[in-house]
A protein has these predicted regions:
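TPR alpha-solenoid repeat register
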Residues: 61, 169-173, 184, 217-218, ...
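Short coil/linker segments at helix-helix boundaries
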Residues: 68-151, 155, 159-182, 330-365
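Structural marker of alpha-solenoid helical repeat scaffolds
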Residues: 52, 108, 163, 211, ...
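Canonical tetratricopeptide repeat
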Residues: 64, 173-174, 180, 187-190, ...
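Start-of-domain marker
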Residues: 21-81
Length: 385
């Protein structure tokens, strides 16, 4: 009998404690809804409920937690509207907290009940609130980004992007309709790179590739992330992808060629160039790649042939002009190394005349490079002075 009494008392205490926590949730919501809310008290009550085993797995608990943050935001914005002092960071922090709480609420509300049914009564209202307040996640991210607090900035930018992939936001089709998402994703990528979070770089760079202005730089960061993690195969794959996606960006091409050259894999580099040319025979970049590879392999005649083909497609390709000039200079040097150095040698004059021809062949290409890019002296200075 004593054991039964003790067991009953334990059950009674557990029920009472659970009831007390549920009461805290209701009280926290009530306080937050007052005209002059005591947010410190409301947050204290809800924070206890968020960690208590009796209430932490209830969707209602997280819904109220989100509601409190929503009310904090509303009160700060009310002060701003009335031109009273208000805390900008509190506005942004409340939006991020609200977002996180509502996301958790939705996850819990999607768990089927004992009958196997899902009754999510929170999704409709909470998704609308997130959608309305989502722009402030950008503002918060910018605020912290400009303060060089990149970990905090990443949280905001990441939340903005992640919102587009949430099941509760599926009907909004944000990945297609949100035109500034790629730009925000780029800043998420940048912040992630600054704190060394390569996994986050990989995650958000994928969305940033569509950003017209910074997509190429997101691709660079993505490529570097694979290299940093030691995934050489994926790194090479992304370099190749970068060449195709952003043909004007020399980073991908230069790194790929450097990798193949340094690892004695010129045949693979040439195969890549040939595969690209098979798909697009008149693509100036692929012709340039092939010329550059021959150039590195010291097959100067082939290099000249493909640099000229490149310039046939685009006469204003300054780098091709510069490299074509350089190949002629290299031929001159190669010829000079074998030519007689003695001025009294009967073949000396003939050899010097041949060397001069190479320099004369190089000059117009260096002049063209200077005309096209006068500020980039490294493209033409060595060939003209």
């Amino acid at each position: 009998i004593m054991k039964r009494v003790l067991f009953s008392m334990v059950l009674l205490m557990a029920v009472s404690f659970a009831f007390a926590q549920e009461k805290n949730v209701k009280e926290a919501k009530s306080i937050a809804g007052e005209v002059k809310p005591d947010f410190a008290k409301a947050e204290q009550l809800i924070n206890e409920a968020l960690t208590n085993p009796e209430t932490k797995d209830n969707a209602a608990t997280w819904d109220v937690a989100g509601y409190i943050q929503k009310r904090i935001n509303e009160k700060e914005m009310e002060n701003a509207y009335l031109r009273k002092p208000y805390d900008t960071l509190k506005v942004y922090n409340s939006v991020l907290n609200m977002y996180n709480y509502y996301v958790k609420c939705d996850e819990l509300a999607q768990i089927p009940n004992e009958k196997g049914k899902i009754k999510n009564k929170y999704r409709s209202a909470n998704s609308k609130t997130i959608l309305a307040e989502r722009p402030n996640l950008i503002n918060g991210g910018i605020q912290y980004f400009n303060l060089n607090k990149n970990e905090d900035a990443l949280k905001y930018f990441a939340a903005y992007v992640d919102a587009a992939t949430l099941p509760m936001m599926e009907k909004e089709n944000l990945l297609e309709k949100d035109t500034i998402l790629p730009q925000v994703a780029y800043y998420a990528t940048l912040a992630a790179d600054r704190v060394g979070d390569k996994d986050a770089v990989m995650k958000y760079a994928q969305y940033a590739l569509k950003d017209k202005e910074n997509g190429q730089f997101a691709m660079q960061l993505l490529t570097d992330a694979y290299k940093a993690k030691g995934d050489t195969a994926k790194w090479v794959e992304k370099l190749q992808e970068g060449i195709v996606k952003f043909p004007e960006n020399q980073y991908f091409f230069a790194n790929l060629v450097d990798y193949y050259s340094s690892s004695n894999q010129n045949d693979k580099a040439m195969q890549f160039a040939d595969d690209m040319l098979a798909k697009d025979p008149n693509n100036k970049l692929y012709l340039y790649v092939k010329a550059y590879l021959y150039h590195n392999m010291k097959d100067y005649e082939k290099a000249i042939e493909f640099y000229k083909k490149t310039l046939d497609i685009d006469p204003a390709y300054a780098e091709a002009c510069s490299n074509l000039g350089l190949v002629y200079l290299l031929q001159a040097q190669e010829y000079a190394d074998k030519a007689p150095a003695d001025i009294n040698d009967p073949n000396y004059a003939t050899a010097q005349a041949e060397i001069k021809k190479f320099y004369e062949a190089a000059k117009p290409y260096y002049e063209k490079a200077r005309e096209l890019k006068p500020d980039q002296k490294d493209l033409w200075l060595q060939g003209l002075y």
